[in-house]
Amino acid sequence: TKQVEKNEDGDQKIEQDGIKPEDKAHKAATKIQASFRGHITRKKLKGEKKGDAPASETDAADKKEEGPAGGAAENKESEAPAATEAAAADSAQQEEGSKDSSAPAEEKKGDGAADTGSEQPAPQAATPAASSEEKTAAAAAPERESTPKASTDNSPSLKADEAQDKEEPKQADVPAADTTATTTPAAEDATAKATAQPQMETVESSQTEEKTDAVEETKPTESAQQEEMKEEESKADQENA
């Protein structure tokens, strides 16, 4: 029922206007055709002689008097290629727009690749510096462990000398490894740190030497005390006997 009402509304509008849309289109087509033909006939009139002008005018009048159906068909044919041309132009514009959009995208990709390329060397340069620092830390750890061992052991100064001999080649190897492995400013910082660490290690080694000397000095005092205790015990045993 609703569809029927819509159709009735359309019919009422047509009745009010008194002219159907098809009639409007047909009239517009006939006007366009008439103007187009009149333009062609004017060109012909200009090119032809004055005597032939009445004949051309009569031909134009005859063409205008042709059936309206033929005029409408010609109008549709003329409009169809125009529509196709407009569609082709739109598609060409869209293709150009897509090309333009793709070009910036490619440029952005290129820029992104350049950015990543510039960023990659920095981590690569940082890794050798980090590795050198790790090496120095690893070398310092066993050295620090060796120094407490030398202090805790109540051994003579020979072990302390051996520990020093072991530490010296390690200290010599660490800066050499740093200088060969790194060439960046970060590497220079790492080498500075590495040179500072051996200095600290030398200070620690000197402290261990002092500790060993102190231990050796305390040994004779302890032995003297033990001997005195033994002598007192022997004296007491003799008195008891």
Curated annotation (Swiss-Prot):
The keyword ATP-binding does not apply. GO terms for biological process: axon choice point recognition; axon regeneration; regulation of growth; tissue regeneration. This is Neuromodulin. Residues 25-54 form the IQ domain. GO terms for molecular function: calmodulin binding; lysophosphatidic acid binding; phosphatidylinositol phosphate binding; phosphatidylserine binding. PANTHER family: NEUROMODULIN. Residues 80-95, 118-131, 172-198 have a biased composition (Low complexity). Palmitoylated. Palmitoylation is essential for plasma membrane association. It comes from the Eukaryota. Its main location: membrane. It comes from Serinus canaria (Island canary). It holds the Pfam family IQ. Binds calmodulin with a greater affinity in the absence of Ca(2+) than in its presence. Residues 1-26, 132-147, 159-171, 208-220, 232-241 have a biased composition (Basic and acidic residues). This protein is associated with nerve growth. It is a major component of the motile 'growth cones' that form the tips of elongating axons. Plays a role in axonal and dendritic filopodia induction. It is found in: Cell membrane; Cell projection, Growth cone membrane; Synapse; Cell projection, Filopodium membrane. The keyword Membrane applies. Belongs to the neuromodulin family. Keywords: Calmodulin-binding, Cell membrane, Cell projection, Developmental protein, Differentiation, Growth regulation, Lipoprotein, Membrane, Neurogenesis, Phosphoprotein, Synapse.
